[in-house]
Each structure stands twice: as C-alpha cells, then as structure tokens.
Amino acid sequence: MSATPVPCQSSNCIKDRPPSRLECPTCNKLGIKGSFFCCQECFKANWKTHKIIHDIATPRQPLLDDPNINKDGTFNPFGTFKFTGPLRPVYPLSPKREVPAHIPRPDYAEDGIPTSENRKLGLPPRILAPEEIEKMRNVCKLAREVLDIAAAAIRPGITTDQIDAIVHEETIKRDAYPSPLNYRHYPKSVCTSINEVICHGIPDQRKLQEGDIINIDVTLYKDGYHGDLNETYPVGRVDEDSQRLMRTAHKCLHEAIKLCKPGALFRDLGKTIEPIARQNGCSVVRTYCGHGINDLFHTAPNVPHYAKNKAVGTMKAGMTFTIEPMINLGHWDLEHWPDDWTSTTIDGKRSAQFEETLL
C-alpha cells in the first residue's frame, strides 16, 4: 500500500483511473515504483500484460538445456504469442542505462509516472513564451543531431540494443536526458521499430538484416523541454514496396507540414495525409496521433493523421506539437506484443513513419 494515491495504471480501468493505493506486490519487491491499481478486478484484468514488466526488470537466466534458448543465449520471451508477422523479439534486454546525476531529468525518471502530464489532462494547448520557444528550438536541434548519428550506424549486423547505446551516449554527451527512458516504465532510451512494427519497438539483441526497414524515434529532454522526431531508414537494399511505403510516409508528413500556420485546423491535416496514403496503396494508422510537446512529453493538442477525424482546436503562434503519420502497406489496425509497448500491423505487413516537432 502506498501512502500517496496515484491514478490506476490500467489502460482500460473499469473506474476511469481513480487515485489508488493498491500496489503490485511483485513490483514492490523488484523496486519498480508506480504500479498501482484501483481494485483487484483491474489488477487481475491487466495481469497478462502487466507481468511482462517483471520479466523486463528481472533478466531471465535460462537453463542450458532449455530448447527455447539459442546457442548464443538469446531467446524469444513470448514463445506462445501469435505474432502477426515474421519479426520476433530477441532477449535478454540489456540492463537499464544510467544517466549521470548532474543531468536534470523529467518527473517520471525515477518512478515511471508522468505526474505533471496526469495533472494537466484535459487542459487546452499551452502557448509558449519567447524564452521557452528558444529552449524548444535548442532541444529539437540536439535531438536531430542524435538521430542523424544513430542513423549513420545503421547496417546489417548491428543490433537495435547497440543503436540504443549510441542514442543514450550521444544524448548524455549533450547534457540531456533520453525522454523515453522509464516513461511509463519504457525500458530503453529510444524506440526502434522494424518492418511490421508501427511504433514503440523496444531495442533488443536482434541484428538488423539486409532488406529491413527501421524507424528510429528520438526524444531529448534538456533545460526542462522535450524535442521529438523520428525517421524510417532502409537497411541496405530494400524491395520496391518498402521504398514506396517510405516515400509515401515521408510525403504525408511534409505535405501536412505545409498546412501549418496560425488559424489552421488540426483536424484538416488528416484530409491531406490520408488521400496521399490511399493514392499509393497504403493506409493511415488511426490508433496513434501527433501530440503537443513542451515541458511535457505528451500533452494537448491531439493531432490525428486520418481524414474525417474530430480533432478540436486551431493552430496558434507559440504552440509546439508533433506531426507523425504512421503509414501501413496493409490494413491500418494494429496488435500489441505482450511487452505492452511494441505495436505491429494487424496483418504483418510493413509500416513506416516520419515525425517532426512543429512550432
């Protein structure tokens, strides 16, 4: 039991995420903070996905005669899960990377709970002051530097965990904090999404292969502000469908950016993005949206990328938000892996994404 109530951590809470003191006992033993539920029913309903946190926090030491273990010691932790495509996770995950004590960090860095975000749910988009805008420009510039360095390392044979290490080290070289690290208990410093993974892929021991495509999603936190961007890259030579997919996703983003100005409606971005995707035989993911970003990692406004959405609000000078359309070769719907982060296409076909932070 916790002395200070926090919102229920269930994503589909039956009581609309009220404050709660009921803590997962296993998380408590492992030192994982912030795993609270409003009632036993919510805890039981989320057990199948929640328990994955325990596996991540406690790297498995498999038996040598375990048939599910590869000769190099790697393994698929979700062997009974019905994957939608050919990609598989390759565990164990490396230990959590350390951030030097002198680097300021967001409020969720220790316990995984973005308290400031939770407090400001439902509030309108914030207009930044000139000095805040300069901090946003600086952190976005640094995030671009880190992304470009990580992208230069892409080659067949490198693991996504090695890419995570590059992003982490380059981030702390800039006296910044890697925003994804421990955000809602995400275990790594960057998201690496390969082939059919739409977003939030967790870096692991899988080696990139010739013909893969990979999205690297970098966010830095510095001077109290977050800068967020991502791009999708080919690994060596890729097939024509993958090239078409990446071209389409890139065009969707940049045609939407052209619409951005004070007075433009957020809901109109999808009217430009979705026709481009359809004309190229692709679909637009509806589950995830762009978002406001400033001193909070995710905040208002929501920025849908599909047509006929019901997003509210107009763009105003001083707002900062992301546009990040996720484009699929097949159906727009998705499936989550049991790690509760990795989102893949429902049909196993490939997905690509490009993202920028807009001012």
List PLM regions with ranges.
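Active-site neighborhoods and metal-handling regions in enzymes and metal-associated proteins
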Residues: S2-P5, N12-S20, G31-S35, W47, ...
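Cys/His/Pro-rich metal-binding microdomains
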Residues: Q9-I14, P25, C39-F43
